Regions:
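Acidic/polar loop patches that form or flank catalytic/metal-binding clefts of enzymes
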Residues: 30-33, 93-94, 126-137, 204, ...
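Juxtacatalytic substrate-recognition/specificity segment
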Residues: 1-109
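Beta/coil-rich, acidic/histidine-enriched accessory regions frequently appended to metallopeptidases
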Residues: 216-335
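Soluble non-cytosolic domains of exported or imported proteins
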Residues: 4-16, 67-72, 76, 106, ...
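Amphipathic alpha-helical substructures
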Residues: 165-258
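Acidic/His/Gly-enriched intrinsically disordered linker/tail segments
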Residues: 90-98, 103-183, 213-218
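Acidic/histidine-enriched alpha-helical segments
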Residues: 33-40, 136-140, 208-209
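Generic, well-ordered alpha-helical scaffold segments in large soluble proteins
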Residues: 13-24, 60, 76, 80-84, ...
């Protein structure tokens, strides 16, 4: 148990999040009343693995101790619980049936994880465990992570999903410069879809429920064209735009969609110098491991593998690094 024990409302809040997920989908849980959540609390780690009638979650003690940690744990619960609809039963056509003996490529991973990631932000609010300001904060941070990933200019959402086996799950320190997560970019795409659908009197939840009725409930796999077929009667231009969002990098109209709901993202100035270097020790030598895109380090011509000899005539070695540490880039703030 965590120091001081679990929050008294934890079990009740988990139940409320599960009920909120059923409310979102408009149906009782397809797994019935025999669904098991296994939560493993670890020193470090975060994630979950969904099954037909259960899911295993991993969360860290340090994460739970953070200001927003409890809400993030409830979001993780909602994410995995929603997967009993979207993933376990409503699947891209390539996963009908699942083949656990090989890596199966599917662009539909963006829908499986991106849509779920978008809705998990709202489930604590729907459950009454959070408020709108917290949802706005979480959404701002999620969109910020996409905007601060240089790889979004290189890799499309469709490519990110299809290359998951060879890139996302074999990432390196330079991956952010050429790749983008289909979880995060998928969630940002879901946000844009939701805003555009709400502008014509519908919503992304309506789309998800519609696909559940037409495909998930009966075990039919869905294809990209099924999304277009659902969108065209409501907003023909949105169906075309979605094709563009999936196939082209860095075209998602995040700022326009935020403006449609009366919001914007304000960059927060860094409080310390930002050089953009990730350094490593190579037998006492100081070697560049990464020079972030658009950073002063990259602009000056530094690339991975370069050795830094001296700064201001001071010889560098691994024990003395007269460079300010690279601070985490702050998120944009919703306004």
């Amino acid at each position: 148990d965590p120091p001081g024990g679990w929050p008294k409302a934890f079990t009740a809040d988990v139940e409320r999040v599960c009920e909120a997920t059923c409310q979102l989908m408009g149906t009782s849980p397809p797994a019935g009343d025999r669904y098991q959540l296994v939560i493993q609390m670890l020193d470090s780690g975060y994630g979950g693995l969904e099954h037909d009638h259960s899911s295993v979650l991993q969360f860290s003690w340090s994460g739970l101790a953070k200001k927003d940690g409890y809400r993030q744990l409830l979001q993780l619960v909602g994410h995995e619980y929603l997967h009993q609809w979207n993933v376990r039963r409503l699947r891209p056509i390539e996963y009908r049936p699942y083949d656990y003996g090989r890596s199966v490529v599917s662009e539909g991973l963006w829908f499986a994880e991106g849509i779920t990631s978008y809705f998990d932000l709202a489930l604590p609010l729907i459950a009454g465990c959070s408020d709108r300001s917290m949802l706005l904060q979480d959404l701002g941070e999620e969109l910020s992570r996409v905007l601060m990933t240089p790889g979004r200019r290189i890799q499309s959402l469709s490519d990110s999903a299809q290359e998951a086996w060879i890139k996302l799950y074999k990432s390196s320190v330079v991956s952010p410069d050429s790749q983008v997560s289909y979880y995060r970019l998928g969630a940002a795409t879901a946000f844009c879809l939701d805003v555009r659908l709400r502008a014509v009197g519908s919503s992304l939840a309506d789309l998800l429920r519609g696909l559940w009725q037409s495909h998930g409930r009966s075990g039919r796999g869905f294809h990209r064209r099924d999304l277009s077929a659902w969108l065209k009667p409501l907003e023909p231009r949105l169906a075309t735009d979605l094709e563009h969002w999936l196939d082209q990098p860095d075209v998602l109209p995040l700022h326009d969609c935020l403006a449609m709901i009366g919001a914007r993202l304000n960059p927060v100035p860094l409080q310390r110098p930002h050089h953009g270097l990730t350094l490593t020790d190579s037998n006492g030598r100081v070697v560049v491991r990464r020079a972030a895109s658009d950073s002063p380090a990259r602009t000056s011509g530094l690339v991975p593998g370069d050795e830094l000899i001296a700064v201001d005539s001071r010889r560098l070695h691994s024990g003395v690094l007269p460079l300010p540490p690279l601070p985490p880039r702050p998120p944009f703030q919703p306004a």
